Amino acid sequence: AIGETTFTGPEDLINPEGWFTIEELQRAALQRCDNARDAIRLMGSLAEPYGYGDGGECLTIADRNEVWQFEIVGIGKDRIGAAWVAQRVPDDEIAVSANIPRIGKMKRRDKDNFMASDNVEQVAKDNGLWDGKGTFIFWKAFNTDYAKGKNFNDREYFILNHFAPSLGLTYEMDELPFSVKPEKKVDVRDVMAMLRETYEGTDFDMTK
């Protein structure tokens, strides 16, 4: 199963001459792959040489055993290619993405939990999105003003804090964890409740 959310990313990375949109990458993965890891590898192997023509996108990819988050951007208005990263959601944890890139530090040596194209850091450098100093953080490099300098908005914060309140997460933090371990089992009804939440009675109340 594959879910999708758009984070757009810097417009200077978008080249509509790229062959693949996110829908086409998803279609190819669903047709040809029976697990999340192979789906990620296939999408990367198609988008890198033939080009990715969309804005920044995030896919949540689930198979019978694992769930991964895959984030992808173009590499420049006049360049054909793609830069992407994927992170595995740990067993017994939950993750959420709502129009904001969520993956932070890329631990390339941890192949059980991370995958990425070889060019991610260089694309960020080439486009003035990272100065090459310090730890490279994917979401910081490829974010937009919508996120206001963070890797979350009210939706990510509300859900993560709801299921793991003892972590003491606050909206004032600059960064929230990629995933959290819920303090009680989460079922389908819990997910449905979160998706229809209007945050009534909170600072994010949508009913006012």
Map each language-model feature to its residues:
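Gly/Pro-rich turn-and-neighbor structural signature
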Residues: L42, L46-W68
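Short, solvent-exposed loop/turn segments at the edges of secondary structure
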Residues: F20-E24, D54-G56, R79-G81
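Short acidic-glycine loop/turn motifs at beta-strand connectors
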Residues: A62-N65, I72-G76, Q87-D92
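Acidic/polar low-complexity flexible segments
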Residues: G56, D92-S97
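Compact, glycine/acidic-enriched structural inserts
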Residues: T8-G51, I100-A124
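A mature extracytoplasmic/lumenal domain signature
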Residues: T6-T8, G74
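Short hydrophobic-aromatic micro-motifs
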Residues: A1-E4, W68-Q69, A95-V96
